[in-house]
UniProtKB/Swiss-Prot annotation:
Transmembrane segments: none annotated. It comes from Mycobacterium avium. Coiled coil: none annotated. InterPro entries: A-crystallin/Hsp20_dom, HSP20-like_chaperone, Small_HSP. CDD domains: ACD_sHsps-like (cd06464). Not known. This protein is one of the major immune reactive proteins in mycobacteria. PANTHER family: HEAT-SHOCK PROTEIN 20 FAMILY MEMBER (PTHR11527). It comes from the Bacteria. Belongs to the small heat shock protein (HSP20) family. Residues 21-131 form the sHSP domain. This is 18 kDa antigen 2. Pfam families: HSP20. SUPFAM superfamilies: HSP20-like chaperones.
Length: 138
């Protein structure tokens, strides 16, 4: 005997997508954290070819685009839960980040961006000048 969990609403949603050809927007999960003088962002993109990735920054908006190709139409799918086609995600970057020095690496289905904090935004010590005044003997 095999036990199966069923969710009738999920099944109905999947059936509607198959019949009507509608899909929810593809999800591009990410994690982001600060590591010293830089921010690190990782996007999960399993099954995406590195050549289909596109990154651009315009006015402090970082856009990540990716494409996961459609499956062979001759297949009769039993389950198709991974998003297909072109999808994107935008991040709004603060003025305190140096968008000219963003580094991107893609390995094992994870896109990792390293975004340094701008020099002008880093904490710095300000020297205080003090002038010694001599009193005038009156």
């Amino acid at each position: 005997m095999v036990l199966m969990r069923t969710d009738p609403f999920r099944d109905l949603d999947r059936w509607t997508q198959q019949v009507l050809g509608t899909r929810r927007p593809a999800v591009m999960p990410m994690d982001a954290w600060r590591d010293g003088d830089q921010f690190v962002v990782e996007f999960d993109l399993p099954g995406v070819n590195a050549d289909s990735l596109d990154l651009d920054v315009e006015r402090n908006v970082l856009t990540v685009r990716a494409e996961r190709p459609d499956l062979d139409q001759n297949r009769e799918m039993v389950s198709a839960e991974r998003p297909r086609g072109v999808f994107s995600r935008q991040l709004f970057l603060g003025d305190n980040l140096d968008t000219d020095k963003i580094e991107a690496n893609y390995h094992d289905g994870v896109l990792r961006l390293t975004i340094p904090v701008a020099e002008k935004a880093k904490p710095r010590r300000i020297e205080i000048n003090h002038n010694h005044r001599t009193a005038i003997n009156a």
